[in-house]
Amino acid sequence: MITQKISEELNKALAKMGIHDTQETKILVDKTKNIKFGDFYTNIAMILSKKNNKSSLEIAKEIANNFEQDLFLEVNLQPPGFLNFKLKAKDHENLLKQIYYEKDRFGQFSKKNITYNIEYVSANPTGYLHIAHAANAIYGDILANLLKIYGYDVETEYWINDAGNQIDKLAMSVLVRYLQLQNINIQLPADAYHGQEIHLVAQTLYQTYKNQFINVRLNEKYEIDDDIANQEIKNFAVKYLLNEIKNDLASINTFIDTYTSENWIRNSGRILEVLSKIKPYTYTLDGALWLKTTTFGDDKDRVLIKSDGSYTYFTPDIAYHDYKFNKTNTTKLIDVWGTDHLGYIARLKAAMNALGYDPNNLEIVCAQVMKLVKNNQEFKLSKRSGQSLTIKDLVEIIGKDALRWFLGSSSMNSHVIIDVDIALSKNNNNPLYYVQYAHARANQVLNKQVYELDFKTDLLTETRERELLNQLHFYKQTIANAANNREPHRISNYLYDLAQIFHNYYANVKINNDNNKVLSAQRYTLVWCVKQVLANGLAIMKITPYDQMY
């Protein structure tokens, strides 16, 4: 990785200068904005000037003088203190060989012996997945792919909230619809689940059990008055809807490794184990058991067991995270939540602290709100159900590739707006089309005639050829940056930039030169490598690379 090579040489040069604190100083190595200055640059001299009471140019010159000779074709200085590096043709040749021989493995890093557990989606199994869940699912899925490619072992996980009031309400809603199917005069309460999927669960329940529950009723609290029937209906409804959730996720190419049940955690004895572990940080007040989360930075203490003896939502969640940390080889946890859970972060980290875990090994990322617009008007309701847009609706409207692109190309720090007209357009205004077209165009060039490959780059002197080479060099660094910063959108940004350079190259440079077969071979090799890297980047996002546009 060329950026790593430059960073290593910078550290050697700085060590010769007596500067050894570079671990605290983030060395930026990036592509130059203007190719005439060089291929890559660093701003380290400007950072160090503030610490060493020297001008940036003076430090940059001293660094350059301490570089080993012949490492780069050229090292030059640019005010106010940039160090620019022009690469040798051999660096480019080695890159093209690596891409060609590694093919779809290009971009993968060596194993790091660290295992991440990434939990995402984790919607209550009370209905179909909706528009907000799509953003959560796609972010988590692409992040998992990134971390795997970056060398980590990764397990993905879904926390099934199959206990508590919402599941009782689900069973009650299904029972009412089931009884209505048999012409029983009973009304569904206003605060019950009214979605189309509840009708489908009830119909399937009837097909399976016939009239077994026909005499079951609700009490004055709108609770099912038969404990056995209540449990059977709950189990049936959760299983049915969880299967629908898995189908929804599969429709957007998302497959989660492990589904962990809250009921299982509750019945496994793990909650009692956790309560024993954190006992030194608990106290009783007003008949309730509290955890002293303020000891670890929370704004107030939190209830674990209510005065009626029931657990709060917090308690099984603590046990669940303890379970995840205790899985074989699990080192770090990442939870992907919605923004409505922002206030929950401090208390969960405090609980991990109380359990003796490093709270920094639990990362929590919150997905932002997303919306769909068409003709500047927001889509809010599904035509099919009259309710919030589901993942099924989104796939039907714009397709899974477009959904993965537009959600995967958005920062988690900003609201996501998907313009349907742009997402469906087949022109350069659609960034996904633009990138897929670059792959198809490269494929078209390579299939047009028989060509030879030549990994040398001495004849690739066009500005756009150097820009393409530098962008290819930066692919692995982009993966590292995206993985380390938990920013999957860096991949789509990279692909768009690569596509843009390639489209400009195609429009301005004749790739096949009948008068110079060696030049043609070098250009075909470059195009082959561009196509491969486009395909590899799209694979991280689980998006189809087209060989021809339709």
UniProtKB/Swiss-Prot annotation:
GO terms for molecular function: arginine-tRNA ligase activity; ATP binding. It catalyses: tRNA(Arg) + L-arginine + ATP = L-arginyl-tRNA(Arg) + AMP + diphosphate. It is found in: Cytoplasm. GO terms for biological process: arginyl-tRNA aminoacylation. Disulfide bonds: none annotated. GO terms for cellular component: cytoplasm. Gene3D superfamilies: Arginyl tRNA synthetase N-terminal domain, HUPs, Isoleucyl-tRNA Synthetase, Domain 1. Its EC number is 6.1.1.19. Keywords: Aminoacyl-tRNA synthetase, ATP-binding, Cytoplasm, Ligase, Nucleotide-binding, Protein biosynthesis. The keyword tRNA processing does not apply. It comes from the Bacteria. Signal peptide: none annotated. HAMAP family: Arg_tRNA_synth. NCBIfam families: argS. Monomer. This is Arginine--tRNA ligase. The gene is argS.
